[in-house]
Regions:
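Active-site mouth loops of central-metabolism enzymes
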Residues: 1, 20-34, 110-118
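Metal-associated gating/positioning segment near the N- to mid-region
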Residues: 1-17
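Generic hydrophobic/packing signal
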Residues: 14, 18, 26, 40-43, ...
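Histidine/acidic residue-rich metal-binding segments in metalloenzymes
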Residues: 34-180
Length: 180
């Protein structure tokens, strides 16, 4: 969902059906900064709408229009919006280069080969660079590699220890707990 109207529909459905707490991210595209601002505001005028957690960016290919791989578009989102930005960190250019290496493969290992550690690290580094440049709050979704963890070790801090630096956090899914 990439518009405030769509988000409101999802929030209304959740309010009618959910028995637990909930929250949703509005999806970023390369050309919906104004929609993002409607949902989370700008740096100068942040908005807090209950149930909207922040902005989610897919830096590598996803579903529909949910892809923001252009650095200029990413920088615009980081610069012109408020709140939390959560990223699925995968470098689209590297994935496009590697796609031919797995063409015709259907084995489960093809996915990990195609979307390798470097693919994740490149996008993670770019996200962190933009967070530092803009002071934007950043969360790296679903950390997948030890090299990303090593890189982020110098960039992730508890909110109480971030004076002068943006808050950058991450998390990991159980299936990725096979770091080297």
């Amino acid at each position: 969902i990439t518009t405030l109207e769509g988000m409101q529909g999802k929030l209304d459905t959740a309010a009618a059906k959910c028995v637990s707490n909930y929250g949703f991210f509005i999806g970023a595209t390369e050309d919906n900064v104004e929609d993002l601002q409607d949902a989370v505001g700008t740096r100068e005028n942040p908005i807090a709408i209950p149930g909207i957690c922040g902005i989610k960016i897919f830096m590598g290919v996803s579903t529909g229009t949910l892809l923001v791989s252009d650095k200029t578009a990413l920088e615009k989102i980081f610069t012109e919006t408020a709140g939390l930005i959560a990223v699925h960190a995968e470098d689209e250019d590297r994935m496009n280069e590697r796609r031919k290496l797995v063409e015709g493969r259907t084995d489960v290992a093809a996915h990990a080969y195609y979307r390798d550690d470097i693919t994740a690290l490149l996008a993670t580094k770019l996200s962190v660079e933009l967070a530092h440049k803009t002071g934007h709050r950043l969360h790296i979704l679903h950390l997948t590699s030890g090299i990303e963890a090593d890189f982020l070790n110098d960039h992730c801090n508890l909110p109480s220890k971030t004076e002068g630096h943006p808050i950058i956090t991450t998390e990991v899914l159980p299936q990725h707990l096979t770091f080297d």
